[in-house]
Design a protein with these regions (language model features):
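C-terminal motif of bacterial Sec signal peptides marking the signal peptidase cleavage site
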Residues: 25-29
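Early extracytoplasmic/lumenal segment of secretory-pathway proteins
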Residues: 49-139
Length: 418
C-alpha cells in the first residue's frame, strides 16, 4: 500500500470551502432518519438525525448518474482519501492480495481537507473518501459523489438498520456510499496525572493545565464547546450543538478563545496527538479512540472517558467519488470493508463501533470483551450522550433561518479561536 501523508499541510483553508456554500446556506432542516438499534437496543437517534439528508428545494447534482450493474475485474489501483488509521495493513494487504487492487492512501487531517480533495468529483484522481457527517452534505450537494448500487454490497443486509440507508449518505433513496464505523470524540488523560477519570470537560478549560492540553484543529470543535455550554450555561438555550444562534455561537467561540493559552497543540493528524502524549507535552486532550488504542498498545498510561456533559462523535461513510477512475476496485473495497471480519478488525484497531451487527462476535474472537469495550452492544444511555457530527446550516431544525452556517464556523475558528 502506498500512502501520502497530509502531515505538512495546514488545515486552514476557508477558501477551499466555497464549493456548495451557496446551496448550503439555504439548506433546510435535516431529515430524522431511522430509529433502529445499532447496539443493545439503542435507537441511535443522533446517528441518523444529525447526519444530514434530503433537503426541500435542493437536489444532488449527480443523483441521476447510472450506477454499476455488475462488479468487473479490478483496475489494479484504488486511490483512497482516509482518516489516519483507517487503512491499516492488517486489512489492506489481504484486500490487495485478493483483488489485485493496490491501495494508494491519502490521509486527510480534517473533514475540510476531505471536502477540498473531493472537489470536482475527486478530480479524476481519487476513488473514495471516508467522510464524516460534517462533510457529507458539502460533498453531496457540490456534486462530488457518485450514486452507489447497494445491491452489489452483500454484507449491507447485515448492517444495523439505522446504518443501512442513513440520512448522512442516502438522499431520496439514492445511496452515495456505504456506512463504515462510528464513535465518540473522547477526553483523554494521563493516568499518572489523574488517578481517577475527570468527570467533566472542565479540565480542558482549567488554567491549571496551561500548555498541557491538545484539541483537534477543526472548526467543528465549536460544537464541543457548545456541548459543554449546554450543560453549564443553560440560559443560552442550546438544544443542538450544530444549530447555534449567533449568541450561542459567540459564547462557544469565546470559550474556545479563552482556552487558547492552555493549548500545547491544535492537532491535525492523530499521530501528532499521540506524539505529544508520549513525549509528556500533553496530559489532557480531546481525541479519538484510535489515539487511545495506539497509546495503550505502546503501554502508555492513557485513560479515556465521556464526561457528564456528553460528547460529539462521528459516523463515517466510504463515499464514491463522482469521477472515480477505478470503479470496480471501489466496489470490491466496499464489499470487503463491509464484511464482519474486516469491520471487527477496524473496530478493535481503531477503537470504534462497527455498523455490521455480525461484527460483534468477530470482535470478541480478536480481543475478548472488545464488543462491549467498544460499545457495539451498549445501552441507549450511551448513544444519547453523543451528538454526531453534521454540517452546520443557516436554517435551523425549527425552520428558522437564524442559525450560524459552517462558513462562519471556519472564519471564527481561524480568526477568533486560533
Amino acid at each position: 500500500m502506498k500512502r501520502t501523508s497530509g502531515c505538512s499541510r495546514p488545515i486552514r483553508r476557508p477558501a477551499t470551502l466555497a464549493v456548495g456554500f451557496a446551496a448550503l446556506a439555504v439548506l433546510a432542516a435535516c431529515s430524522s432518519g431511522g430509529s433502529s438499534s445499532p447496539g443493545g437496543g439503542a435507537t441511535a437517534n443522533s446517528a441518523t438525525a444529525n447526519g444530514g439528508g434530503a433537503v426541500p428545494g435542493q437536489t444532488v447534482p449527480t443523483a441521476n448518474l447510472p450506477v454499476l450493474q455488475k462488479v468487473g475485474k479490478g483496475e489494479g489501483q484504488l486511490n483512497l482519501i482516509a482518516w489516519e488509521g483507517y487503512l491499516d495493513p492488517k486489512w489492506v494487504k489481504p484486500f490487495e492480495q485478493q483483488t489485485g487492487c493496490q491501495v494508494n492512501a491519502k490521509y486527510a487531517g480534517s473533514s475540510d481537507e476531505m471536502v477540498s480533495l473531493m472537489k470536482n468529483g475527486g478530480g479524476g484522481q481519487y476513488d473514495m473518501v471516508s467522510s464524516s457527517g460534517d462533510a457529507d452534505l458539502r460533498i453531496l450537494y457540490a456534486g462530488d459523489a457518485h450514486p452507489v448500487n447497494i445491491k452489489l454490497i452483500p454484507s449491507w443486509k447485515d448492517f444495523f438498520p439505522a446504518f443501512q440507508s442513513p440520512a448522512f449518505n442516502t438522499i431520496n433513496g439514492v445511496h452515495y456510499g456505504v456506512s463504515l464505523q462510528w464513535g465518540p470524540n473522547v477526553l483523554m488523560y494521563n493516568t499518572k496525572d489523574f488517578k481517577t477519570a475527570p468527570s467533566s470537560w472542565d479540565v480542558i478549560y482549567d488554567s491549571k493545565y496551561k500548555g498541557q492540553v491538545t484539541v483537534p484543529d477543526n472548526p467543528i470543535q465549536i460544537a464541543d464547546a457548545a456541548v459543554y455550554l449546554k450543560k453549564h450555561k443553560p440560559s443560552l438555550g442550546i438544544t443542538d450543538p450544530y444549530e447555534l444562534t449567533q449568541p450561542q455561537f459567540q459564547a462557544a467561540v469565546s470559550l474556545l478563545a479563552s482556552q487558547k493559552p492552555l493549548i500545547e497543540k491544535y492537532w491535525s493528524l492523530a499521530s501528532q496527538e499521540i506524539f505529544d502524549f508520549k513525549n509528556g507535552n500533553a496530559i489532557l486532550g480531546a481525541g479519538w479512540p484510535y489515539q487511545v488504542s495506539t497509546l495503550k498498545a505502546a503501554n502508555f498510561p492513557i485513560g479515556t472517558t465521556i464526561p457528564a456533559e456528553g460528547a460529539t462523535g462521528w459516523a463515517d461513510t466510504w463515499m464514491l467519488a463522482a469521477k472515480a477512475p477505478h470503479p470496480n476496485c471501489s466496489y470490491l473495497w466496499m464489499q470487503y470493508i463491509s464484511t464482519p471480519k474486516v469491520q471487527a478488525q477496524q473496530a478493535v484497531t481503531y477503537g470504534e463501533t462497527p455498523d455490521n451487527k455480525l461484527a460483534c462476535a468477530e470482535m470478541d474472537k480478536l480481543q475478548a470483551g472488545s464488543c462491549a469495550e467498544y460499545h457495539a452492544n451498549a445501552p441507549q444511555s450511551y448513544f444519547d450522550a453523543i451528538s454526531l457530527w453534521k454540517t452546520p446550516l443557516a436554517t435551523c431544525d425549527d425552520g428558522k433561518n437564524n442559525c450560524v452556517p459552517y462558513a462562519q464556523w471556519v472564519s471564527a475558528w481561524n480568526t477568533q479561536v486560533k
